[in-house]
Amino acid sequence: MPEPGPDASGTASAPPPQPPPQPPAPKESPFSIRNLLNGDHHRPPPKPQPPPRTLFAPASAAAAAAAAAAAAAKGALEGAAGFALSQVGDLAFPRFEIPAQRFALPAHYLERSPAWWYPYTLTPAGGHLPRPEASEKALLRDSSPASGTDRDSPEPLLKADPDHKELDSKSPDEIILEESDSEEGKKEGEAVPGAAGTTVGATTATPGSEDWKAGAESPEKKPACRKKKTRTVFSRSQVFQLESTFDMKRYLSSSERAGLAASLHLTETQVKIWFQNRRNKWKRQLAAELEAANLSHAAAQRIVRVPILYHENSAAEGAAAAAGAPVPVSQPLLTFPHPVYYSHPVVSSVPLLRPV
């Protein structure tokens, strides 16, 4: 067997040349777009989710099989896509916080506003929670037959259910709206009469409506009470005849009054009223005269002082004093040695003389 040549042995024993080593591939950043979209590749594949619980049991086995097939198809789609819908919640998205004061109404305004305007309540953390009474009223509004036309008006909300008027959680604006609507209804009921000629029964139930009716009827009755009295003007001959009759008789009988009215061309009522006024005037005159007499009598009761004005032998005393002879002193003719007080002015001031 011939030995192989040096060329053949050299080529057979020499190792094959190796290619130059390639540089390592650059490591992808965990914040790359593909990683953010596809999620983490090292996570195990998601487990198939159990079928959702239904509130009502399926009507047949075919419905149950269809629900299971739908759940399996959903799990397969999620596995093929490489990420589950539940992983979306694990992604860290940047959070933007916007101050609520710039885009929201003030809290006190929203709290006071009626439910049909803003059906949410403000929480201390700034969240918005649906108001229970607003949701109930919205359902009542949608179910009411008038919801198609008056959907934007507050009247269906306030008049949909009378039981909701007793809720304590109502805002002041809703209460004011209800009161105004009821008052308008009352006024309309008072103004519009019924088919039988009577007003609406609701207006007569409250005492306020009775007061309103009394006030409405009073202007019609007041003109009747405020009739202008006609003043009768008597002629001189009529006044003279009436005065002469009054001097003879203060009160007339019906027959006398009728005869006097016929003679003077007056009515019996005019004659009767004239005699009433004349009697009142006569009574006033009597009272004035009596008062004047009482005043004069009271003035006469005043005490009058009467001094001593005359002595009997005043002339003889004067002559004796001139001659210088003593004259026997005698008492004066007046019975009172001192001034006397008389109680009546009729008494004359002449001194009372004593007979000798």
Curated annotation (Swiss-Prot):
Comp. bias (Basic and acidic residues): 130-140, 149-173, 210-223
Induction record: Regulated by Six1 and FGFs in inner ear.
GO molecular function: DNA-binding transcription factor activity, RNA polymerase II-specific; RNA polymerase II transcription regulatory region sequence-specific DNA binding; sequence-specific DNA binding
TM helices/strands, residue ranges: none
Locations listed in the record: Nucleus
Entry keywords, A to Z: Developmental protein, Differentiation, DNA-binding, Homeobox, Neurogenesis, Nucleus, Phosphoprotein, Transcription, Transcription regulation
Extent of Low complexity compositional bias: 191-208
Stretch list, region Disordered: 1-57, 129-229
UniProt modified residues of type Phosphoserine: 153, 180
Phenotype seen when the gene is deleted: Mice display abnormal circling behavior and severe vestibular defects owing to a depletion of sensory cells in the saccule and utricle, and a complete loss of the horizontal semicircular canal crista, as well as a fusion of the utricle and saccule endolymphatic spaces into a common utriculosaccular cavity. Moreover, most females have a reproductive defect: females can be fertilized and their embryos undergo normal preimplantation development, but the embryos fail to implant successfully in the uterus and subsequently die.
Pfam families: Homeodomain
Name used for this protein in its record: Homeobox protein HMX3
Organism in which the protein naturally occurs: Mus musculus
